[in-house]
């Protein structure tokens, strides 16, 4: 029947679970639908609120914000909450820590709090401020997911979070004897950790010289891209130490630490690197720095059990510099590799592949630049993996079909004994050759593996 309201016939418990998927500002809007819907949003087992949901110019802004939260928490004080997500980064809101503590006592499974280290006065003057999390956070028996940004953590003494599996810490400040190592030690089932270290020093904290991640349960460790080209540290050099025998996936997409130490990564499956082993974007690896050489060598040895690897152009440059003064260890378990090679470093490719004797799948993206002064490309040495194990090669990032591109394709076709597929992927159509022309040129080349299939396509 047209206009028939079927949603209102659903049980209240199901409706509130549906509303839980919406930001609170949207679930509140349903209160005008009918008398039955008037207070349904107050029974939703979670809060998702941001300071931008309230008029910032209101003189009673902070009080309106906190009163709204109080009304929500007090409407059904005996009910259990599932989620508490609040972004309050504009101003200092007195008493907000107590509201987080109340939500924790209500049995929330997810806490997502975004604070700020700078607050605005009414005269538009900024001043530094740290919002400390309530101490009952560290003894929550129900939290499964914890997300904190720009928050501060004190040492609670007792720390036990028996259900916490997922933790995201972005620019968290550590106070006194509190540290990441201590926090992780109280999370016996932690599986997934994301860490963004603060590189800004307008507020002093008590970050230790070495940030340790020690966990037997941790399976995924992720340092995301957060600062981009402006990544540089204004605080003293710090070291990251990872000791996690159960770790399966590790991604380091940015240099947040000047030194990285890895221990006992016996279960490592996938590693993704976009680092150059120095925080400041203006600095690069110095081959004359003996301590840095040893650090990189130990790091590579520590991750050498990985089976899949993704490395960026930045990391390839660092490894090429390192290879002139040190030896890249063998990654005997590695079967899949995706690497971005700057075109001037293509001569380094055979020596680089020597470190992966059992490689089966290679995705090679070539980073061309108009101002690259590339020497004549001569790929002579043939590593073991090309002769014995390499089955699939995809070459990406191609713009043209000229002599250099032909040499790269010929290198794999003429030397790869068990190659099953070679894919040439062009960013744009070649200027002087169509895909069919490229295919014909490749098909004429000598193939060591007669079963190799050639594919030419566009990215």
Swiss-Prot record:
Residues 374-426 form the FBD domain. PROSITE patterns: FBOX. This is FBD-associated F-box protein At5g27750. Residues 4-50 form the F-box domain. It comes from the Eukaryota.
